[in-house]
Regions:
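Conserved phosphate- and dinucleotide-binding cores of soluble alpha/beta proteins
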Residues: 3, 10-20, 24-28, 37-221
Length: 221
């Protein structure tokens, strides 16, 4: 299991313990990007081991040299595509954030809707590709901008690696994952199409104008 660095995805850690207790579930191991809530799950025995390549708060920093079964790993062990034993390829679930998601489930975490560089991908594309289930958690809109849109500015993580998009206005499942659709139906969890989420976002904040690009190439992804 892993969560990304975005607020919504990190917040998922805060709500895990209740559901794990109710269902008698224990997590074998977690990787990341580790923060305090995941460390607490480790200390309470809800997680078998934590193996991290970076820490997001002081609780995680202190834990790595104080808590048994909290281990450090290198970036090569974490996500080197030439390493057959990379940890990202062993993930069951990853919960990640997004600046934009489009109707093909492509995700942008690099550039804003204005094309300006806003962040860094980190392990976003690696964990999405390697995990059995990639869940994107994001608000439908940010201010006056639609998060779910027709086409993202920059494809950081391709849509065929993204399985579920969770927003404050509904859940969309990638049609490439009929098994997940069946699971949600069986559990009585409502879901909608990604296109309907886009239209809802546009109805709230309007349809954005297309970006106008100049000829100079500043980066290739």
């Amino acid at each position: 299991f892993q969560t990304g660095v975005g607020g919504p995805s990190l917040a998922a850690n805060l709500f895990l313990e209740k559901y794990m207790d109710e269902r008698g579930i224990k997590m074998g191991w977690a990787i990341g990007g580790i923060c305090g809530p995941m460390v607490e799950l480790l200390k309470k025995g809800k997680v078998g081991k934590v193996i991290d390549v970076q820490d997001f708060d002081l609780d995680a920093v202190n834990s790595i040299h104080q808590t048994p079964n909290h281990f450090e790993m290198s970036a090569r062990q974490y996500a080197n595509p030439a390493n057959k034993g990379a940890f990202v390829n062993k993930l069951d679930f990853v919960v990640l954030a997004a600046l934009e998601v489009d109707t093909s489930f492509n995700v942008n975490v690099l550039t804003g809707s204005d094309g300006v560089l806003r962040g860094a991908p980190g392990g976003h594309p690696d964990t999405a590709a390697g995990s059995k289930c990639c869940i994107i958690v994001t608000p439908l809109t940010r201010g006056r901008m639609a998060t779910v849109c027709e086409q993202v500015v920059t494809v950081t993580t391709p849509g065929d690696c993204v399985d579920v998009v969770v927003t404050d206005y509904g859940i969309a499942v990638n049609p490439l994952r009929p098994d997940l659709i069946a699971c949600l139906d069986e559990a009585g969890i409502p879901h909608v199409s990604i296109e309907s989420l886009k239209e809802k976002a546009y109805s709230l904040v309007g349809r954005p104008d297309s970006l106008e690009w100049e000829d100079q190439v500043v980066a290739v992804l």
